[in-house]
A protein has these predicted regions:
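Structural signature of transmembrane alpha-helix termini at the membrane-water interface
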Residues: 20, 24, 51, 181-188
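A transmembrane-helix-recognition feature enriched in membrane-embedded lipid enzymes
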Residues: 165-190
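A structural signal for short, hydrophobic/glycine-enriched beta-strand patches
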Residues: 23-167
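Intrinsically disordered, low-complexity sequence elements enriched in Ser/Thr/Gly/Pro
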Residues: 1-3, 45, 121, 177
Length: 190
């Protein structure tokens, strides 16, 4: 009985330690100088802002802004809105809009391959939401091999590594872990 209790306590402490570090494990923020910055689709505030910040800091001379090709906001396509946004930027000549037709990060990596050919870059800096960095890096490495680094776009309203402090953070942490596990165990091998 004493041994069982000890195993239960040690197992419980191990589970708590894993849970406490699970949010931090998801986040990879290690940008390196690259040939091109690729801002992943799915969010239109923090990701583009982080990409522009890295462009201004000289991490790469070009930026690809991924935009859902078929998404509409009222009567305008997201691509039209993105074009108008880019035209108003001082860095407009360094930015290319990359239309994304897929609905998953894996599909997005396949769509990006065509856009990368036009900017000829082997060293790619991915920009995505902080919680999405580890999975995105793994997916791009598998689907579209290149020399990748990744930069996290932080949004405290959406996620924090101390995920237990806010309900929304806990939901995002749980959802991203499900997606990461599914990618590693199933989708990666298709």
């Amino acid at each position: 009985m004493g041994r069982f209790r000890l195993v239960l306590i040690v197992g419980g402490l191990f589970a708590v330690a894993l849970g406490a570090t699970s949010g931090r494990f998801l986040v990879v923020n290690q940008p390196h100088k690259s040939d091109v910055i690729v801002v992943l689709a799915g969010e239109t505030d923090r990701r583009p802002a982080r990409g522009l910040e890295l462009l201004d800091q000289g991490f790469a001379p070009r930026l690809l802004l991924n935009v859902p090709a078929e998404a509409k906001i009222y009567q305008w396509s997201q691509a039209e809105i993105a074009r108008k946004y880019v035209e108003g930027l001082p860095q407009a000549s360094s930015i290319t809009i990359c239309p994304i037709y897929g609905h998953s990060t894996r599909d997005e990596a396949q769509d990006v391959s065509g856009c990368l050919q036009s900017v000829s870059g082997r060293r790619v800096l991915l920009v995505t939401s902080d919680f999405h960095t580890r999975r995105a890096l793994s997916i791009f490495n598998r689907v579209l091999p290149a020399d990748y680094s990744v930069a996290a776009a932080f949004d405290a309203g959406e996620f924090g590594v101390q995920w237990w402090r806010h309900r929304e953070w806990a939901k995002v942490n749980f959802d991203e872990w499900l997606r990461l596990i599914w990618w590693e165990l199933v989708d990666r091998w298709r």
